[in-house]
């Protein structure tokens, strides 16, 4: 996991949230230790595996955010996982996503396109894949949050490595993809006429 890529996301968003994942079972009423810690910029959420326990002060130190820069970054720390997403490694509703061999840029955002098993399109900003660049193999799955909104679960083997809410598909994206589709059809017809 590339922490520098996560730092860049958080600084661009002006927001970082540390999230503590409590243990599965408490031990004899003692204050339970944190099982896993996560970090989010509000769109992507990544585990902080292999690092010591972080708090607001330590994440600012790691991200080189001094007192002068602190007003440009909202830092929060939640003692529990947010209720909408599923943070488990394996989820029975996981829908494998096929990454389309097609990337595009729209309004300055580089986009990755995925298709779910029903043929529906999911799009994420490419910058949210950067933390996974050190791994050769990652698989993506569609999950639904408690409100029925889709999000992408990124797995490395059987281990959850990130959760990403998709890019909103608006008119501009639909029109751009439609124009690409139409232009490709015209080009294919012209190629056929040459034969």
Where are the language model's segments positioned?
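C-terminal functional regions that serve as terminal interaction/effector modules
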Residues: 41-44, 49-50, 57-195
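Glycine-centered loop/turn motifs
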Residues: 20, 54-57
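Intrinsically disordered, low-complexity linker/loop segments enriched in Gly/Pro
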Residues: 1-33, 38-42, 46-48
